[in-house]
């Protein structure tokens, strides 16, 4: 998914634009067998995406911003020594998403969930924040079982995207059904690359003003088709901890699709 078409839509008329989006794709997948009985479904390998939101602002009221949305920048703020200023709250958050809760279904609450989300992509506000979170994850009782791959860094993104990709590929290994990884990023690997083994993306950065194009480019990293150890990836997930932002982005995306 490229951001360029989003930026160019205003330069073209309706009769010059052809749209084929995720909703159309999944609709075609669901109707294929009825419309084309006996023919192989060309959309069968494309996973369904499900977006789950958890309202951290309700649980951690101190981190609301001026529009009452969750402030990830403040939540993950680090001091001059690279330590989290709100480390206690971040540890609470990490414990929370591993907490068994039948009503909330936190993503790492059960062994079954952890096996399904054995390879995930976490977006953070910046390089220093990713480095600090990497240290906390490695010492955590649950996330310490995962290999933490920190691809957040400074420098030219295009030059280092390939290096970041190789870091993730090495960590996942040749038998992804046996390994566990969490990839931390603040920008890299959000465009132009695919990691088929990723089944979830955690949106822990951005704000109420995050652009629809940037958001959609990032979350669709996890919709890449995959067959691992004979099993087809049929579902992929987005976990966003700022529900208002999620709704705003989806509404903007719907407007863009309708316009196209």
What residue ranges belong to the model's regions?
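A short beta-strand-to-loop transition that corresponds to the Sensor-1 phosphate-sensing loop
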Residues: 1-6, 126, 186-188, 242-244
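Conserved RecA-like P-loop NTPase helicase motor core
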Residues: 148-259
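Interdomain helical connector at the RecA1-RecA2 junction of SF1/SF2 helicase-like NTPases
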Residues: 8-121
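Structured loops at beta-to-helix junctions and adjacent beta-edge loops in soluble globular domains
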Residues: 52-57, 125, 241-244
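Hydrophobic/aromatic beta-strand patches that form the interior of the parallel beta-sheet core
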Residues: 1, 18, 49-52, 149, ...
